[in-house]
From Swiss-Prot:
Coiled coil: 364-429
Gene (UniProt): P/V/C
Pfam families membership: Paramyxo_P
Compositional bias ranges of the Basic and acidic residues kind: 7-20, 83-101, 150-168
Region L protein binding, residue ranges: 412-445
Region (Interaction with the nucleocapsid (N-RNA)): 479-568
Location of region: N0 binding: 33-41
Protein name: Phosphoprotein
RNA-binding keyword on record: no
Assembly and binders: Homotetramer. Interacts (via multimerization domain) with polymerase L; this interaction forms the polymerase complex. Interacts (via N-terminus) with N0; this interaction allows P to chaperon N0 before encapsidation and form the N-P complex. Interacts (via C-terminus) with N-RNA template; this interaction positions the polymerase on the template.
Region of interest called Disordered, as start-end residue ranges on this chain: 1-22, 40-320
Entry note about domains: The N-terminus consists of a long intrinsically disordered tail. The central part contains the coiled-coil multimerization domain (PMD). Forms a four-stranded coiled coil structure. The C-terminus constitutes the alpha-helical domain that binds to the nucleocapsid (N-RNA complex).
């Protein structure tokens, strides 16, 4: 059971029985070894042996203890002093003669202890109960200085499991000697302890040889209230809050070595300022092993463990969070994600809510939770948008398919209309060709029933050209498009005649001509022919006497015959 529950009584009797004014420190260690050597199960079952006083009249070589039931004897090696500093280092060789000097006082129940001469720096293992291995390792896990769980949690756990009290005894939990003072309260949460987790060295009190009584829950609570332990700050390590009740792992049973553990600085002379009258108070840090994260920040007395510096850092973190929120809102506004910073602060969207909570997080656990929520909400919104896009694409595809069907039906309808139109046109063409008559198809003169508006082909009256009469191939062609070989033969007789006339002038064309142009042309044709001069004069005279076209035609036929006879 817990060492704090052992309350020694009859102080005055003890002071009278004390042989000297001051006991050695090794006697206290031997006394604690006798208490710790008892089995945890027997302590929880029968505590009647605690009423009897302790006598150590036998020599230090005997290594027995007798229980009230008369069970077997168990030998226990002595523990070495755990204190750091020059005053607290006591070797095993020194404890032997001091135990012999004090051996005449404790002999009533044949409780014996044995001191073995081990003076090394390694921890000494101890066998509890029936001599089995207690599981004590070489390197204690408590050397790194982690604070243990709360006092009330230990009390409840020890009440439920009395077997663990022996383990705590073997582990070296803090006990208070009768007549001693409680641990000093240096400040709020024990933050100003300045590495006083080391055991303060002091001389032993003369009153520590009293009779042990049966501890009751009320006495245990009184001792626990008096021994208010606080977690200490060892060196430059940060404070670790107490462990959550129910999740605390039971530490291994062990004794620390004589020297200071390797993570703690050696205790200075200021820590051993207790006077000779003040009894030694043995304190041992109860800190969880590495890797155990503690959650609770307040002990049983309700005081906060962390100092005011932590609160200042928290306020500073809140200010940084506010500035980071403003920067994030400004960034989102600049990127065009939101319209204004007010929208970021007042938005009800899950992503914005988790983003604000992540920026306002006070610790990494809350920040991790909010960041996970932000990622999941963003993924959910992205998945929702992807689903919406899929639905939209599906609707577009359906619309395209319907448009294709409509276009196909329209094409078929257009083909039908074209074929009907062509059939109507062919029918109309047949009707117009027959002239609207279906019975008499052999008739030569047909009058069409449908008259199309078309340009009538009128026969153009060809003007008579006298030069055409001599050239059969170039008939009815004007002079301007004739070949050059014929131009040499025709010397433009009209101009030649005018030039030869003495009265020819530009004004002569303005006079009214008594001769028609056709008759004039025919006379020029006769005069330009290769006939003799007499024949030319006879033909010109006969033309002037002609009154009808038939007469002119007959005269010109005669002229042509004469010209042909001459050319042939």
């Amino acid at each position: 059971m817990d060492q704090d529950a052992f309350i020694l009584k009859e102080d005055s009797e003890v002071e009278r029985k004390a042989p000297g004014g001051r006991e050695s420190l090794s006697d206290v260690i031997g006394f604690l070894d006798a208490v710790l050597s008892s089995e945890p199960t027997d302590i929880g079952g029968d505590r009647s042996w605690l009423h009897n006083t302790i006598n150590t009249s036998q020599g230090p070589g005997s290594a027995h203890r007798a229980k009230s039931e008369g069970e077997g004897e168990v030998s226990t090696p002595s523990t070495q002093d755990n204190r750091s500093g020059e005053e607290s280092r006591v070797s095993g060789r020194t404890s032997k003669p001091e135990a012999e000097a004090h051996a005449g006082n404790l002999d009533k129940q044949n409780i014996h202890w044995a001191f073995r001469g081990r003076t090394g720096t390694n921890s000494v293992s101890q066998d509890l109960g029936d001599g089995g291995d207690s599981g004590i390792l070489e390197n204690p896990p408590n050397e790194r200085g982690y604070p243990r769980s709360g006092i009330e949690d230990e009390n409840r756990e020890m009440a439920a499991h009395p077997d663990k009290r022996g383990e705590d005894q073997a582990e070296g939990l803090p006990e208070e000697v009768r007549g001693g003072t409680s641990l000093p309260d240096e400040g709020e949460g024990g933050a100003s302890n300045n590495g006083r987790s080391m055991e303060p060295g002091s001389s032993h009190s003369a009153r520590v040889t009293g009779v042990l009584v049966i501890p009751s829950p009320e006495l245990e609570e009184a001792v626990l209230r008096r021994n208010k332990r606080r977690p200490t700050n060892s060196g430059s390590k940060p404070l670790t809050p107490a462990t959550v009740p129910g999740t605390r792992s039971p530490p291994l049973n062990r004794y620390n070595s004589t020297g200071p553990p390797p993570g703690k600085p050696p205790s200075t002379q200021d820590e051993h300022i207790n006077s000779g009258d003040t009894p030694a108070v043995r304190v041992k840090d109860r800190k969880p092993p590495i890797g155990t994260r503690s959650v609770s920040d307040c002990p049983a007395n309700g005081r906060p463990i962390h100092p005011g510096i932590e609160t200042d850092s928290t306020k500073k973190g809140i200010g940084e969070n506010t500035s980071s929120m403003k920067e994030m809102a400004t960034l989102l506004t600049g990127l065009g994600v939101i319209q204004s910073a007010q929208e970021f602060e007042s938005s009800r969207d899950a992503s914005y809510v988790f983003a604000r909570r992540a920026l306002k997080s006070a610790n990494y656990a809350e920040m991790t939770f909010n960041v996970c929520g932000l990622i999941l909400s963003a993924e959910k919104s992205s998945a929702r948008k992807v689903d919406e896009n899929k639905q939209l694409l599906k609707q577009i595809q359906e619309n395209v398919e319907s448009f294709r069907d409509i276009y196909k039906r329209f094409s078929e309808y257009q083909k039908e209309q074209n074929s009907l139109l062509m059939s109507n046109l062919s029918t109309l063409h047949i009707i117009t060709d027959r002239g609207g008559k279906t019975d008499n198809t052999d008739s030569l003169t047909r009058s069409p029933s449908v008259f199309a508006k078309s340009k009538e082909n009128k026969t153009k009256a060809t003007r008579f050209d006298p030069s055409m009469e001599t050239l059969e191939d170039m008939k009815y062609k004007p002079d301007l498009i004739r070949e050059d070989e014929f131009r040499d033969e025709i010397r433009n007789p009209v101009y030649q005649e005018r030039d030869t006339e003495p009265r020819a002038s530009n004004a002569s064309r303005l006079f009214p001509s008594k001769e028609k142009p056709t008759m004039h042309s025919l006379r020029l044709v006769i005069e330009s022919s290769p006939l003799s001069r007499a024949e030319k004069a006879a033909y010109v005279k006969s033309l002037s006497k002609c009154k009808t076209d038939q007469e002119v035609k007959a005269v010109m036929e005669l002229v042509e015959e004469d010209i042909e006879s001459l050319t042939n």
